[in-house]
Amino acid sequence: GPTGIGVLFGKKEWLDKLPPYQGGGEMINHVRWSGTTYNELPYKFEAGTPNYVGSYALSKAIDYIQSIDISSIAAHETQLTAYCEAQLAAIEGVHIYAADQPKAGAVSFNVYINGKLIHPFDIGTLLDQQGVTIRTGHHCAQPLIEELGVPGTARVSFGLYNEKEDIDIFIAALKKAIIMLS
């Protein structure tokens, strides 16, 4: 759907105390030399013209997810994650982080050839050239990556629209990338 939509969810007592991060539109009651008085919730955090298209799209996305049932989606992602881990574990030189631990639809890994770490960016680039998109880098968790002692990881993620065949395509592309780097 359209970009630029979000939801701020919190306790009223905290939201009342929280200042808005930007100003404009109906969020302000009064502006004076002595200070600004903000509108009541939720308007206090709605600067500028509301994103009507984004809010409609978000509403429809929520309806869609509710019609499927979030637990069914979670079960599907869990099955895909387990399948992917099994496929990755069968490839020599692939190190899976938190192998056999519960995960939420994503597997982080690195590739070693002859004991030498292949930079995850190189893996991501070669997969991209084959039409497979993964995420590489710190994943907004740089302290963890530093603790692991690696420059980053490769991460493959799954969602509602993925199937086992997508993982098979990813695994075939990864094997080809490893051969190219060997």
Identify the role of each PLM range.
Residues 1-182:
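Pyridoxal 5′-phosphate
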